[in-house]
């Protein structure tokens, strides 16, 4: 009876450890990816609302240096109105001290056309910005 109790205790501890470790891993990954997801959501919310100037302000500095707000608004207006979108994947990495990410977004346009986009982001001064 004592052996069975010890075995059950060990099994229980292992299960709790695996569950706890899994939860900790989930929270760590979530903490790393949520800011990139949130920045992408804010960007696509602005695009969906037709707020192209607001979406432009969410772009990284490199992109804003090479593309004027007027040109960006013209390009996005010509691309068609976004009816909806779903974020289907988030990947974040740090290389040589520079943190970047890619968020995969399935975009649906008015009229039903769909396209999957790999949205590149960079972290600038503690903020995530779309850089494409």
Residue ranges and their predicted role:
Residues 10-11, 56, 127:
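Secretory pathway export signals and precursors
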Residues 13-15, 60-62, 129-131:
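Functionally engaged cysteine thiol sites
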Residues 31-36, 44-48, 64-67, 109-113, ...:
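Extracytoplasmic/periplasmic, Sec-exported soluble proteins
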Residues 7, 52, 120-123:
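Secretory-pathway extracellular proteins and peptide precursors enriched for disulfide-bonded cysteines
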Residues 42-45, 52-100:
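Short solvent-exposed beta->alpha transition segments
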Residues 93-132:
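Exposed beta-sheet edge and beta->alpha loop/turn motif
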Residues 2-45:
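Short, low-complexity N-terminal intrinsically disordered segments enriched in polar/charged residues
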